[in-house]
């Protein structure tokens, strides 16, 4: 006899969601793909992938994300970065969405957020689109069939792309809405089919919940040395900076590519899958990720393909620069079976410098690491957010401001404590431009970045000779095997040294202006490490 695939005492009607058409609980991948094809949501691709376009929204909509303002969360939410929504407006939104859902079929996935059983979040994701069920099943952690019979969700996400919000009635910015209600343990998503909103909603929940447990939630990828989970490394970075690419290293075991927690036990992945950008993806540069684009169950999102042969075009960005594939971790041959690692020995902060000023790698003191973590300097890459069409320099605190419900200092102090306790080495790595700014310079060669990271992770880089950067105060290696010396000194890569100096001074000023907001909230050693 097969196990029931849902808790019989926790169906949607038990949560007050009634009047729907057929409700499909915890379908497996073949059934979800079959349903999505029958419903005309997309096409079956080569190898059993699912090809889909998300329509108008091909990236996240951070300006349409709201947190419901209640006394319970009033003092703990970073309101300067999170748009408030009044409880009464949320209730109207909730009621109107439930009314809109009546008579329609829905797909329910009961999943875990977090590989550490003691810290995981039990999440129910209710989706209008069958392929969204496949996506979130790929991305989160899948319970065993025997666990589903007793599954009780702590939070529920309802995603209804066909629902358009009414800004006047629902207290939101536009017809697109992502509304988080921590009191009601409910997230409502409307008028966007971009699947990334589902996974980032779970990330936002964990970013709120875990700090109270002394756990540092991080927008980072992570891996560890082969056969040694205690030699782990984390890679902070905004979307498009190289988290997925650089952590998928054949010589190391992948823990995860995007979202992790750092507890007293070490590192744990929040997810059970990866959501990789596919623009200009190649079998030569990234063989593991490329191979997933032809494996059963992978969701291929917003990629152009030949209608006759179904061959994917990895260079055609006519739909978006933010084309992606979503696949379960087990599709990566060197992925960890547990998604766990020990205390990190190396903390790497990835920045995509569109000004072409920062070196390819720099060694940071713990105070400098705290400074750069709070600064979060990088560039938004095209397509990752609505309206971003070219690399746009930005300061995204904690390398993930759109997903941080609490104030930055909360996460910064947690990181400071973790680094102090473990003695992890800290590095800043520029995967952006060299030899000039975006438009004149070129992207940092990935071979050089990989060589520098290998040297940092195996410890050999600590034996190199370092120079102190005159503009930013951190230490930069003078020579590293396998990397052109000139590349390590960004001023030498520019044809006009004076132009480099001017650009560097400009960036120093930007760092200084941005960091003023944290000046009264940090320790003296971090203040002393400030740039400018």
Swiss-Prot record:
Keywords: ATP-binding, Cytoplasm, Decarboxylase, Gluconeogenesis, Lyase, Manganese, Metal-binding, Nucleotide-binding. It is found in: Cytoplasm. Pfam families: PEPCK_ATP. It catalyses: oxaloacetate + ATP = phosphoenolpyruvate + ADP + CO2. Mn(2+) binds at residues 200, 219, 258. GO terms for molecular function: ATP binding; metal ion binding; phosphoenolpyruvate carboxykinase (ATP) activity. ATP binds at residues 200, 219, 237-245, 286, 324, 449. Its main location: cytoplasm. Coiled coil: none annotated. Substrate binds at residues 60, 194, 200, 324. Pathway: Carbohydrate biosynthesis; gluconeogenesis. One of its GO terms (cellular component) is cytosol. Binds 1 Mn(2+) ion per subunit. Disulfide bonds: none annotated. One of its GO terms (biological process) is gluconeogenesis. Its EC number is 4.1.1.49. SUPFAM superfamilies: PEP carboxykinase N-terminal domain, PEP carboxykinase-like. Belongs to the phosphoenolpyruvate carboxykinase (ATP) family. Involved in the gluconeogenesis. Catalyzes the conversion of oxaloacetate (OAA) to phosphoenolpyruvate (PEP) through direct phosphoryl transfer between the nucleoside triphosphate and OAA. This is Phosphoenolpyruvate carboxykinase (ATP). It comes from Paracoccus denitrificans (strain Pd 1222). The lineage of its organism: Bacteria, Pseudomonadati, Pseudomonadota, Alphaproteobacteria, Rhodobacterales. The gene is pckA.
């Amino acid at each position: 006899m097969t196990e029931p695939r849902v808790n019989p005492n926790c169906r949607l009607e038990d949560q007050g969601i009634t009047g729907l058409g057929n409700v499909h609980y915890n379908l497996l991948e073949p059934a979800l793909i079959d349903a999505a094809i029958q419903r005309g949501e997309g096409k079956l691709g080569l190898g059993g992938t699912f090809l889909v376009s998300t329509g108008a929204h091909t990236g996240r909509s951070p300006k349409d994300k709201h947190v419901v303002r209640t006394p319970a969360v009033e003092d703990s939410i970073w309101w300067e970065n999170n748009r408030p929504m009044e409880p009464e407006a949320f209730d109207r939104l909730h009621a109107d969405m439930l009314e809109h859902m009546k008579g329609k079929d829905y797909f329910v996935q009961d999943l875990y957020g977090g590989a550490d059983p003691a810290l995981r979040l039990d999440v129910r994701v209710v989706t209008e689109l069958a392929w969204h069920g496949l996506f979130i099943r790929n991305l989160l952690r899948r319970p065993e069939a025997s666990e589903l019979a007793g599954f009780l969700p702590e939070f529920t996400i309802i995603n209804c792309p066909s629902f358009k919000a009414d800004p006047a009635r629902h207290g939101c910015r536009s017809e697109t809405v992502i509304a988080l209600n921590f009191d009601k343990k409910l997230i409502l998503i409307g008028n966007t089919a971009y699947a990334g909103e589902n996974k980032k909603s779970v990330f936002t929940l964990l970013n709120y919940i875990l700090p109270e447990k002394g756990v540092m939630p991080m927008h980072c990828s992570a891996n560890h040395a082969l056969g040694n989970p205690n030699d782990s490394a984390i890679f902070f970075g905004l979307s498009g900076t190289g988290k997925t690419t650089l952590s998928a290293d054949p010589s190391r075991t992948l823990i995860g590519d995007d979202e992790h927690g750092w507890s007293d036990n070490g590192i744990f992945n929040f997810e059970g899958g990866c959501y990789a950008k596919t623009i200009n993806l190649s079998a030569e540069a990234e063989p593991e990720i490329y191979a997933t684009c032809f494996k059963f169950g992978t969701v291929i999102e917003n990629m152009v393909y030949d209608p006759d042969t179904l061959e994917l075009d990895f260079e055609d960005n006519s739909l978006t620069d933010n084309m992606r594939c979503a696949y379960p971790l087990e599709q990566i041959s060197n992925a960890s079976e547990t998604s766990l690692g020990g205390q990190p020995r190396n903390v790497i902060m990835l920045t995509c410098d569109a000004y072409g000023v920062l070196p390819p790698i720099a060694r940071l003191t713990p105070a400098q690491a705290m400074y750069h973590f709070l600064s979060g300097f990088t560039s938004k890459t095209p397509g990752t957010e609505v309206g971003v069409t070219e690399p746009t320099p930005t300061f995204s605190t904690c390398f993930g401001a759109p997903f941080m419900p609490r104030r930055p200092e909360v996460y910064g102090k947690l990181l400071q404590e973790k680094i102090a306790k473990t003695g992890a080495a800290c590095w800043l790595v520029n995967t952006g431009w060299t030899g000039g700014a975006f438009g004149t310079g070129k992207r940092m060669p990935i071979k050089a970045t990989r060589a520098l990271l290998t040297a940092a992770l195996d410890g050999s880089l600590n034996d190199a000779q370092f120079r102190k950067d005159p503009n930013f105060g951190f230490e930069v290696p003078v020579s590293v095997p396998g990397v052109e010396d000139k590349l390590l000194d960004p001023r030498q890569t520019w044809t006009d040294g004076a132009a480099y100096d001017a650009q560097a001074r400009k960036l120093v000023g930007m760092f200084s202006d941005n960091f003023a907001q944290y000046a009264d909230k940090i320790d003296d050693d971090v203040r002393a490490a400030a740039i400018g």
